């Protein structure tokens, strides 16, 4: 019988000092991806990947934790400064930006890149609670 060896990949430190932090904040979750300037992902985290379930994923605290986790992982690759691209209407937008700054990343620019339709698809019906 052939014996399986441990084939877990080791992370290679990349030494990238500037990058882009993409914050996708929806009504249900917040996803933070940190890339280099070409768009290649270095680190990511989301509220759901950190163990938040259900309506707790959409809280600003969950977004803060996701941003901290992504920032720590990217700083292992030597990341120091980031531009921030924020997309979506969710509750965790500002909390995620503050968490990136508190984690030790220097923020050079903040852009809102939320896609706005020029009267495209019909929106979902209004909620009646």
From Swiss-Prot:
Disulfide bonds: none annotated. The keyword RNA-binding applies. InterPro entries: Ribosomal_uS11, Ribosomal_uS11_bac-type, Ribosomal_uS11_CS, Ribosomal_uS11_sf. It comes from the Bacteria. Pfam families: Ribosomal_S11. GO terms for cellular component: ribonucleoprotein complex; ribosome. Gene3D superfamilies: Ribosomal protein S11. Keywords: Ribonucleoprotein, Ribosomal protein, RNA-binding, rRNA-binding. Signal peptide: none annotated. GO terms for molecular function: rRNA binding; structural constituent of ribosome. GO terms for biological process: translation. Part of the 30S ribosomal subunit. Interacts with proteins S7 and S18. Binds to IF-3. HAMAP family: Ribosomal_uS11 (MF_01310). Located on the platform of the 30S subunit, it bridges several disparate RNA helices of the 16S rRNA. Forms part of the Shine-Dalgarno cleft in the 70S ribosome. PANTHER family: 40S RIBOSOMAL PROTEIN S14/30S RIBOSOMAL PROTEIN S11. Belongs to the universal ribosomal protein uS11 family. NCBIfam families: PRK05309.1, uS11_bact. This is Small ribosomal subunit protein uS11.
């Amino acid at each position: 019988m052939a014996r399986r060896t441990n084939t877990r990949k080791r992370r290679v430190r990349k030494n990238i000092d500037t990058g882009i932090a993409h914050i996708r904040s929806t009504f249900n979750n917040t996803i933070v991806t940190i890339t280099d300037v070409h768009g290649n992902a270095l680190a990511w985290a989301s509220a759901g990947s950190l163990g938040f379930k259900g309506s707790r994923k959409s809280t600003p605290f969950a977004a803060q934790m996701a941003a901290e986790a992504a920032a720590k992982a990217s700083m292992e690759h030597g990341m120091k400064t980031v531009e921030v691209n924020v997309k979506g209407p969710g509750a965790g937008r500002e909390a995620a930006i503050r968490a990136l700054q508190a984690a030790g990343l220097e923020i050079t620019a903040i852009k809102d890149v939320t896609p706005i339709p020029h009267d495209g698809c019909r929106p979902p019906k209004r909620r009646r609670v």
